Amino acid sequence: MNVFWFIPTHGDSRYLGTSQGARAADYDYFRQIAVAADTLGYEGVLLPTGRSCEDAWVVASSLIPATQRLKFLVAIRPGIASPGLSARMAATFDRLSGGRLLINVVTGGDAAELEGDGLFVDHDTRYEITDEFLRIWRGLLTSAHHGESVEFIGRHLKSKGGKLLYPPVQSPHPPLWFGGSSPAAHEMAGEHIDTYLTWGEPPEAVAEKIADIRARAAQHGRTIRFGIRLHVIVRETEDEAWAAADKLISKLDDDTVARAQEAFAKMDSEGQRRMAALHGGKRGSRKELEIYPNLWAGVGLVRGGAGTALVGNAEQVAARMREYAELGIETFILSGYPHLEESYRFAELVFPLLPGRQRANANGPLSGPFGEIVGNHYAPKASQS
């Protein structure tokens, strides 16, 4: 079970939908979160992409020297950037980071934003472009290890004598991750992707996705890994966790929710449509927003993309994670508001319940991350949880 955290380059706060409780989203803050994730034992971090965020490549590159082991899941954008340029960026990042790059393939689901970036095509055409993009991108990085070039002629993209002179550290290329819920997305994942990511839907829906993509991958003679993107609100007691969930959306008003849902409705993203269907665009009680035990849809009232959170005490959150793991989920990409404090809270409360998640400390047990020396002489007692 791999656990990732999240760098909130689109902003961070204690509340959704208001400037109250907000904090500056700047380099110093991003660095604090990255260092915390690296120190606490998270496998990696996801950096979001799009016009609502600081550029993921620039931010991730700036965090390489601040971290030692942390992997960076960074987006490539078929149709917006060329496959050749994207391949060179990936190879350089992978070399400078010592092989710590993971690639998030983002086709995009917001037509207005894509048109602002110069891409004027429909949903399925975007996936045709993504398919051709990945054939060139993968070819360039794979061929770089052998000094070879790439020739490709597609309907949308071409490469004549494409070549990389500096191969990536990882062979044949940094792993490809991707999330998408339409049939076109599933087919593309089955043919090209190493790890498929789903947003946090109830287990039954996730199981259906996994089965479909596994079958599509098998048709191409491939196997594929799976991950899930969720928020998390964990506290020592269940009541405290649900109180924190209520507090997170306590500043929302109906107008803010309506404007957010109106914007989401204009997108042609099947994943975003499925997220919206979980809450119906209305603020409701815990009973109405808890769509499965400990799975809460309140975040998606105003946040695009991943809109659900695991809510509960540590045992409940760990139990839900194990339930998803039994379906085939290997990686959990998590976040919580505010992201710095919640990275510590999740690690302190839940990592001990997930075997193998506490990273060994090279300096010995007394310098471990959890606990202060007692009476200037003794290490604190090990937790019995």
Swiss-Prot record:
Keyword Oxidoreductase: yes
Enzyme Commission number(s) from the entry: 1.14.14.5
This protein's name: Alkanesulfonate monooxygenase
Protein family membership: Belongs to the SsuD family.
Annotated organism of origin: Paraburkholderia phymatum (strain DSM 17167 / CIP 108236 / LMG 21445 / STM815)
Pfam families: Bac_luciferase
Record's catalysed reaction(s): an alkanesulfonate + FMNH2 + O2 = an aldehyde + FMN + sulfite + H2O + 2 H(+)
Function in brief: Catalyzes the desulfonation of aliphatic sulfonates.
Keyword Oxidoreductase: yes
Enzyme class: oxidoreductase
A molecular function (GO) term: alkanesulfonate monooxygenase activity
GO biological process: alkanesulfonate catabolic process
Domain of life: Bacteria
NCBIfam families recorded: alk_sulf_monoox, PRK00719.1
Record key words, sorted: Flavoprotein, FMN, Monooxygenase, Oxidoreductase
